[in-house]
């Protein structure tokens, strides 16, 4: 693998935090990443608030939509629980 290929693969890795309470969870994602995930921005529901340049993607719908779009574009998604 060339250095260019290795660097290209490294930029395709994203790390996010999953925040939860007793009844729900949200994935904390920078607004830029939501914008870069093709077709996701316009499909985000009102259950996923945008605060301080970060979306909190609700687990039942928006989190999966974002995850699927990113993995379809070759990204590796790492999620840690808070």
Where does each model-flagged region fall?
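Short linear motifs at secondary-structure transitions and domain/linker junctions
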Residues: 1-5, 30-31, 53-54
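N-terminal, charge-rich interaction modules
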Residues: 1-16
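Structural boundary micro-motifs
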Residues: 3-5, 49, 60, 71
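Context-gated lysine
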Residues: 12, 32, 51-54, 68
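Low-complexity, compositionally biased segments
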Residues: 12-13, 36-39, 45, 63-65, ...
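A short, structured beta-strand/loop element
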Residues: 21-51
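Short, compact, well-ordered microdomains
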Residues: 56-82
């Amino acid at each position: 693998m060339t250095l260019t290929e290795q660097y290209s693969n490294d930029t395709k890795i994203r790390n996010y935090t999953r925040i939860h309470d007793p009844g729900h969870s949200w994935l904390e994602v920078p607004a830029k990443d939501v914008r870069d995930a093709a077709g996701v921005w316009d499909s985000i529901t009102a259950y996923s608030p945008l605060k301080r340049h970060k979306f909190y993607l609700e687990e039942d719908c928006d989190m999966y939509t974002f995850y699927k779009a990113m993995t379809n574009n070759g990204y590796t998604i790492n999620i840690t629980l808070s």
